[in-house]
């Protein structure tokens, strides 16, 4: 069973990220019968997802947010925050540098560090 994955513009996704839309019941009898369901995952604009993150079914990640490496995202993450952990939780409001990257003063290029 597959459900939709909606991704915004300029989304950075690190290596070994798992984005899952399908799930199954914890109850053995229902699982034996093959019951399964799917929920969409929505990733906003200008989101940065660190390496090794797991995103579970039904989660929405808001615009301009940063998800720390190795996090397990089990619930919605609002816009403009830095979140990390297992389970993923808000660490702080995203600051200008967190949301838009760092300007390299030597060459004037913008990059996320």
Regions found by a protein language model. Give the residues of each.
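S-adenosyl-L-methionine-dependent methyltransferase catalytic module, highlighting the catalytic core
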Residues: 103-112
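Flexible, glycine/small-residue-enriched loop-and-beta-strand segment within the central core
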Residues: 1-59, 94-95, 99-102
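Conserved catalytic segment of ABC-fold P-loop ATPases
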Residues: 62-65, 78-80
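Conserved beta-strand-loop-alpha-helix hinge in the C-terminal portion
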Residues: 79-81, 86-104
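Gly/Ser/Thr-rich beta-alpha loop segments that engage phosphate groups in nucleotides
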Residues: 52, 70, 86-87
């Amino acid at each position: 069973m597959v459900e939709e994955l909606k991704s915004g513009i300029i989304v950075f996704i690190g290596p070994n990220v798992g984005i899952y839309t399908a799930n199954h019941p914890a109850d053995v009898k229902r699982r034996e019968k093959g019951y399964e369901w799917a929920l969409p995952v929505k990733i906003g604009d200008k989101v940065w997802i660190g390496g090794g993150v797991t995103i579970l079914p039904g989660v929405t990640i808001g615009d301009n947010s940063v998800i720390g490496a190795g996090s397990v995202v089990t619930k919605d993450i609002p816009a403009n925050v830095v979140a990390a952990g297992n389970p993923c939780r808000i660490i702080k409001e995203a600051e200008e540098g967190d949301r838009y990257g760092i300007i390299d003063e030597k060459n004037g290029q913008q990059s996320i560090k």
